[in-house]
């Protein structure tokens, strides 16, 4: 009898240990959202690169806001290397992250690693760039990227004098020689920027008000892989060679980094800094804002990344607390597997006439930042 009691006790102990081990194994990544306190929970934040000041600022903003709410943040930058980003996300999962905020390098390459996140009940927030080809992305926060493209084209038309400051046609018929640049083909946003811009410019291209001397009018021809300024500079140099003595009146650029490369090519190619074509941009990076003030780049698009970061943090906090996550778009962002519920923010056109109001008065930059 005594031996039976001992054996029963040992068996019960073994069962308890196995049960605890089993529970521990199921909880490696994250608990079911809303079932545990969030104080001290770990959140992984994966950003694409530190080569752009906007991504450095985005990462810092998200990290600081999450920490204010009591989260422990693992912030990683992948230097625009896809395997590095995948490895970083895997490490976040195995280190016990309860949520992931991901600004992808290539939105089509994360299917396998996000399945790992799903297996651990880890919610995923796509940050500014849509993650494609997987059901395992829960929410998306970004700006209205089609509208950003519209704004870029509108500012180009305004700079050319085709539209006035109110967006009304002036009757100016040109023809204006314009070259077109697009973003990285592996960034889903680049297509939205391009579509918004081209839908705005096409009527003027069809009527002859705008001509493209190089003839390069497709997204594939205009795209700049990884948004690299040096690639944009090289393409602009090649275009100048192709078009010869034809003088350019404008360049549609979807990003400030590309704009800087384009300006370098133009000045090297014989354009003076005070007689450059109308050049657009995006992100209101310091270098481009200074260029706008100096009369070189004409415009940029200001996307307040503080608001974007705040929205991502709000989504993380809501989903981990088991609360309803606020979205304002459930139709636009189809990643080929699902329509990802999204929250879209608004953006603004910045020129020399309003940069102080939009960028300095709002506290985004100080006057010293722009000197």
Task: Identify the function of each model-found stretch.
Residues 2-5, 23-371:
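A residue-level marker of the well-folded mature domains of exported/periplasmic proteins
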Residues 5-15:
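Sec-dependent N-terminal signal peptides
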Residues 18-22:
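C-terminal motif of bacterial Sec signal peptides marking the signal peptidase cleavage site
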């Amino acid at each position: 009898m005594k031996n039976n009691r001992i054996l029963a006790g040992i068996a019960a102990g073994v069962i308890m240990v196995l049960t605890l081990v089993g529970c521990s194994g199921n909880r490696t990544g994250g608990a079911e959202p809303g079932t545990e306190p969030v104080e001290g929970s770990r959140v992984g934040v994966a950003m694409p690169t530190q080569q752009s000041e906007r991504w450095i600022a985005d990462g810092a903003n998200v990290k600081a806001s999450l920490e204010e709410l009591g989260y422990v943040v693992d912030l990683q930058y992948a230097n625009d290397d896809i395997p590095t980003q995948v490895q970083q996300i895997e490490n976040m999962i195995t280190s016990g992250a309860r949520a992931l905020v991901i600004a992808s390098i290539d939105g089509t390459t994360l299917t396998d690693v996000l399945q790992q996140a799903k297996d651990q009940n880890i919610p995923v927030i796509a940050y500014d760039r849509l993650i494609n080809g997987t059901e395992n992305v829960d929410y998306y926060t970004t700006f209205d990227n089609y509208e950003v493209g519209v704004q870029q084209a509108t500012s180009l038309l305004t700079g050319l004098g085709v539209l006035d400051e109110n967006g009304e046609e002036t009757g100016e018929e040109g023809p204006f020689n314009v070259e077109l640049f697009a973003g990285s083909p592996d960034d889903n946003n680049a297509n939205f920027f391009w579509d918004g811009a081209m839908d705005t410019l096409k009527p003027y291209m069809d009527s002859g008000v705008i001509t493209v001397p190089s003839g390069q009018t497709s997204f594939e021809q205009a795209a700049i892989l990884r948004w690299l300024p040096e690639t944009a500079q090289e393409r602009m140099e090649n275009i100048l060679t192709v078009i010869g003595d034809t003088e350019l009146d404008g360049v549609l650029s979807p990003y400030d980094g590309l704009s800087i490369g384009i300006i370098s090519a133009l000045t090297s190619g014989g354009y003076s800094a005070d007689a450059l074509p109308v050049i657009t941009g995006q992100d209101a990076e310091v270098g481009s804002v200074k260029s706008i003030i100096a009369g070189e780049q004409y415009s940029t698009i200001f996307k307040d990344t503080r608001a974007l970061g705040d929205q991502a943090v709000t989504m993380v906090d809501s989903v981990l607390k088991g609360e309803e996550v606020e979205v304002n778009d459930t139709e636009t962002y189809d990643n080929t597997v699902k329509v990802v519920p999204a929250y879209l923010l608004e953006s603004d056109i910045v020129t020399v006439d309003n940069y102080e109001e939009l960028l300095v008065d709002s506290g985004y930059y100080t006057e010293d930042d722009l000197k």
